[in-house]
């Protein structure tokens, strides 16, 4: 097994985390706050002020022997509106912006190729960040695995998308 990680900001992290937990080859997920202005751990309340620059983000650890970052990035694009700025579903604010953040620069070319595919298909410039990971702080415990603990909890993603994600093969 070869474990690698990638970070996806896809709006509210509750739904994005639950979505990626359905995907083949994903070993672990963790919700948190990424690429903000500070190097100290923010609270959810602080992130919601739009003053910290952090995005609600999901750290995805995957088995590179089972799947790859191109497949995961394509899956990500199925779960977001890539043209929307600072908004996904009913959630609005800079913390809900979309982005793909990488700690391993060797992943960038594969991710960039998927961005180009999507941009060519849509014929428009994407509103999705593609940046190196500057920082990531795990969110509070009550946010981790939120939809597993609260199956009737709020989610901006449709339930059918989770079923669809389980059916996809790398």
Could you describe each region identified by the protein language model?
Residues 1-170:
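Flexible coil/turn and secondary-structure edge motifs
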């Amino acid at each position: 097994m070869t474990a690698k990680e990638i970070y996806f900001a896809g709006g509210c992290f509750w739904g994005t985390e639950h979505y990626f937990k359905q995907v083949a080859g994903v070993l672990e997920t963790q919700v948190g706050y990424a690429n903000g202005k500070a190097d100290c751990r923010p609270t959810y309340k602080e992130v919601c002020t739009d003053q910290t620059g952090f995005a609600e983000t999901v750290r995805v650890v995957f088995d590179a022997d089972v799947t790859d970052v191109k497949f995961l990035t394509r899956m990500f694009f199925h779960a977001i509106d890539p043209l929307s700025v600072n908004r996904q579903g009913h959630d609005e604010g800079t913390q809900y912006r979309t982005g793909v953040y990488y700690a391993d620069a060797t992943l960038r070319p594969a991710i960039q190729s998927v961005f180009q595919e999507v941009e060519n298909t849509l014929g428009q410039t994407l509103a999705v960040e593609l940046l190196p990971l500057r920082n990531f702080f795990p969110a509070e415990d009550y946010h981790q695995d939120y939809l597993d603990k609260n199956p009737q909890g709020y989610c901006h993603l449709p339930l059918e998308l989770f079923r669809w994600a389980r059916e996809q093969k790398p």
